């Protein structure tokens, strides 16, 4: 199978993916396309759940989401997001985030399959954090070099149906055990491309410390957040890329370098998506101080 790429960079379109004949796609071929463009849309694929999983396994090691309530009923590898009652978990992703940023190792790839999309203007916003970092003047970059950031997902953890009537302290203790705050270098280096990435997120990154654990002025973090564009309520920052898609497309991106959030459209109706997240086996280094 020969994959054809139309366009360059964020939103490049890939054709030639036959869900019934995936064996000819090599891991290196599809990974290189993603590493190069960062965000690609595999057009008009319409895979079954099994075919979607098979493609994910070609790309990398699939890691199921840690909370079973998000799992597909027959395929736990698949994360289901849906506004249709009983078909998945609603209201996911309506804030800037990096998938699994709160886990011990940054995930390499995220891959989403839309099954139902209400209207033409529903989509996803993306920000290239490597491009942001490259654009910053030295005066903004220097205070972040060699520092460590704390990422805390706890305020976005959803209450599960099984948590109803449980003491809130008990639920909170479980959240702390399962998803405690985690520290990563403020600037990581992509293990494949070598690009430096400003690894921060407005909804998860709570503070920056120097290499000795001393707090860095909170204004440094605030200025970096503003520079990325994720604080722009109108989504007009030049760093924000808007990606639309259609049912049957597959949206695949480099999860180390791109942050994203849902773009809600003007039309009412059901939104249902499947998602896989994968590792690539490459260790993510921090900035070489």
Swiss-Prot record:
Keywords: Dioxygenase, Iron, Metal-binding, Oxidoreductase
SUPFAM superfamilies: Clavaminate synthase-like
Pfam families: TauD
EC code: 1.14.11.78
Catalysed transformations (reactions): a (3R)-3-[(carboxymethyl)amino]fatty acid + 2 2-oxoglutarate + 2 O2 = a (3R)-3-isocyanyl-fatty acid + 2 succinate + 3 CO2 + 2 H2O; a (3R)-3-[(carboxymethyl)amino]fatty acid + 2-oxoglutarate + O2 = a (3R)-3-{[carboxy(hydroxy)methyl]amino}fatty acid + succinate + CO2; a (3R)-3-{[carboxy(hydroxy)methyl]amino}fatty acid + 2-oxoglutarate + O2 = a (3R)-3-isocyanyl-fatty acid + succinate + 2 CO2 + 2 H2O
Effects seen without this gene: Disruption of this gene attenuates M.tuberculosis growth and survival in untreated mice.
Essential cofactor(s): Fe(2+)
Enzyme class, UniProt record, top EC level: oxidoreductase
Record-linked InterPro entries: TauD-like_sf, TauD/TfdA-like, TfdA_dioxygenase
Domain of life the protein comes from: Bacteria
GO molecular-function term, one example from the UniProt record: dioxygenase activity
Residues that, per the record, bind 2-oxoglutarate: 264
Binding site for Fe(2+): 97, 99, 260
Annotated positions binding a (3R)-3-[(carboxymethyl)amino]fatty acid: 65, 70, 93, 100, 158, 275
Function field: Involved in the biosynthesis of a unique class of isonitrile lipopeptides (INLPs) that seem to function as virulence factors in M.tuberculosis and to play a role in metal acquisition. Catalyzes the conversion of (3R)-3-[(carboxymethyl)amino]fatty acids to (3R)-3-isocyanyl-fatty acids through an oxidative decarboxylation mechanism, thereby generating the isonitrile group of INLPs.
Protein family: Belongs to the TfdA dioxygenase family.
Miscellaneous comment as given in the Swiss-Prot or TrEMBL entry: Isonitrile formation goes through two consecutive, but distinctive, 2-oxoglutarate-dpendent reactions catalyzed by this enzyme. In the first reaction, an Fe(IV)-oxo species is utilized to generate a (3R)-3-{[carboxy(hydroxy)methyl]amino}fatty acid. Then, its conversion into a (3R)-3-isocyanyl-fatty acid likely proceeds by decarboxylation-assisted desaturation.
Cited PANTHER family: (3R)-3-[(CARBOXYMETHYL)AMINO]FATTY ACID OXYGENASE_DECARBOXYLASE, DIOXYGENASE RV0097-RELATED
Protein's name according to its UniProt entry: (3R)-3-[(carboxymethyl)amino]fatty acid oxygenase/decarboxylase
Organism: Mycobacterium tuberculosis (strain ATCC 25618 / H37Rv)
